[in-house]
């Protein structure tokens, strides 16, 4: 939210362009870090942060890294795959690029609740597997998925109905608004595939199994999406709609593979931390 607000301020109000977007990102990250540190240092519970007591616990660090690095790489893979799509979008001119930028800003806001539910699934599954309650862990994942579907459906209504107006917040040029509205209405109905991928990936991370979701995402968002873009642009149709559909195509492949893996995954033997 801070990033989006600062984007609007620096780009629309101050006319800073790309430089404004960069400053907005840096400031938003700094604000987030400071607020998080402040809350943790004032918290009275078991996760209170006391800087003078910071120590390395190597066994725990090894477990954190084994889960954290693949999870971080998943985020990097997503950003890296977006570069491929952006490269093809750039061929359609400045107006299309601006419309795509507006779409991605709105996209980040719409998928934020789903990403939060994914993180909640990670925590919920980890806690329940820690006490050996596999059934409750899986039940929580199902409810998180249904909730993500419901939230996405509610958010889709204003996105689909108000697509031109939402795009005009970022750029009021008619051609840009046309591209942005087209992309919003074309791609946003496919967010339900994104829900499946995010919730089940979060659940697998909570079970301490973050490598397979990383490999699935690498294959779907980088390998498959790049093959799709190359074949589509060079042999089928180098138009904005089929090129943009590389996004939901990647989501579909990723969600199908993640769901298939999750349904065949036995959680009974997963327990990241034996005793705390």
PLM regions and their residue ranges:
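Short alpha-helical transmembrane segments in multi-pass integral membrane proteins
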Residues: 2, 13-69, 125-190, 232-276
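Functionally critical, cavity-lining and gating residues within the transmembrane helices
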Residues: 3, 20, 78-82, 93, ...
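Alpha-helical transmembrane segments of multipass membrane proteins
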Residues: 4-12, 37, 83-87, 109, ...
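Helix-terminus/linker motif at the lipid-water interface of multi-pass membrane proteins
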Residues: 9-16, 76-109, 127, 165-174, ...
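Residue-level hotspots within the lipid-embedded alpha helices of multi-pass solute transporters
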Residues: 26, 71-79, 91, 108, ...
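Transmembrane helical elements of multi-pass membrane transporters/channels
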Residues: 28-32, 36, 40, 58-120, ...
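Small-residue-rich hydrophobic transmembrane alpha-helices
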Residues: 99-163, 194-217
